[in-house]
Regions:
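Broad gene-expression machinery/nucleic-acid interaction feature
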Residues: 50-52, 70-74, 131-135
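Residue-level recognition of well-ordered beta-strand positions that form the cores
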Residues: 56-58, 74-78, 135-139
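Short glycine/proline-enriched loop/turn "hinge" motifs that connect secondary-structure elements
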Residues: 63-69, 126
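A generic structural signal for short coil/turn motifs at secondary-structure boundaries
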Residues: 64, 84-88
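Short acidic, glycine/tyrosine-flanked loop/strand segments centered on an H-E-D-like triad
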Residues: 70-85
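Short, charged, solvent-exposed linker or helix-capping segments at domain edges/interfaces
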Residues: 86, 145-157
Length: 179
């Protein structure tokens, strides 16, 4: 998310012309994480921060890949109502949603799965903050198994070892005479 220059500008600048403002430095983009972009679903309202994206995972379910579970990833986009309006009749939370959707819809993220847009709904927190929730289904397939240990591989190694060991093994009783 930090590599999306438009998203960083919309979150960082509170002006209507946020997209026309200079690109953020790497340090400024990195500072958005934890301040504007959160993975802990607790919102501390900061008077200097007026746009937030809260990322959470929920509704875990079994998948075809036993290493991972399918789940729903939600992006809660919260903006101060005074900051909703951007230039050209664009609305800040909807523009943030468009940037997020362009990055995640139908994309495969290693260890998370393939994301599919499920829908969006408006959220109103209070008389000052509101926005949207975007929902994506994360589906884990076999491609995420590539680097995961496979018990069947271990069985083949054990079988090969036993076969080799048993071929070179001469039972002790062949050396003992029963006379």
């Amino acid at each position: 998310m930090m590599k999306n220059k438009n998203l960083c500008k919309i979150l960082y600048y509170t002006d209507r012309d946020a997209l026309d403002r200079p690109a953020l430095t790497e340090k400024q983009c990195a500072a958005l994480m934890g301040k504007n972009i959160k993975i802990i679903p607790k919102l501390y309202v900061d008077s200097s921060v007026l746009a937030y994206v809260i990322i959470s995972m929920d509704n875990f379910a079994p998948s075809t890949n036993p290493q991972f579970k399918d789940n729903i990833i939600s992006f809660d986009i919260i903006c101060h109502f005074d900051q909703w309006q951007l230039k050209d009749f664009q609305l800040r939370p909807y523009r943030i949603a468009a940037e997020i959707d362009s990055m995640f819809d139908n994309q495969h993220l290693t260890g998370i799965g393939e994301l599919h847009f499920m829908g969006a709904s408006q959220i109103i927190l209070n008389d000052e903050f509101g926005g949207l929730t975007l929902l994506y289904q994360a589906i884990h397939g076999g491609e995420d198994k590539k680097n995961a240990p496979n018990p069947a591989d271990n069985k083949k190694i054990v079988d090969d070892f036993n076969e080799l060991h048993n071929q070179s093994f001469i039972p002790l009783d062949t050396f003992i005479s029963n006379e």
